[in-house]
From Swiss-Prot:
Official protein name in the record: Chi-conotoxin PnID
Signal peptide per UniProt: 1-22
Species classification: Eukaryota, Metazoa, Spiralia, Lophotrochozoa, Mollusca
Entry keyword annotation includes Signal: yes
Compartment annotation: Secreted
Protein source organism: Conus pennaceus
């Protein structure tokens, strides 16, 4: 029975404490946006396609 007032006081202190902004997000090194990853993949594929032009229908062979 002695624990009940302590529990109530702690509950009131917790509820009246300063609010924390839940949307604060600290970015780390690996938290880049997914769109930049897609852009990098597209540019890499475009660069590889520009370096070797496909001459055949079934096999992609670099032309001279």
């Amino acid at each position: 029975m002695r624990c009940l007032p302590v529990f109530v006081i702690l509950l009131l202190l917790t509820a009246s404490g300063p609010s924390v902004d839940a949307k604060v997000h600290l970015k780390t090194k690996g938290d880049g946006p997914l769109s930049s990853f897609r852009d990098n993949a597209k540019s890499t594929l475009q660069r590889l396609q520009d370096k070797s032009t496909c001459c055949g229908y079934r096999m992609c062979v670099p032309c001279g």
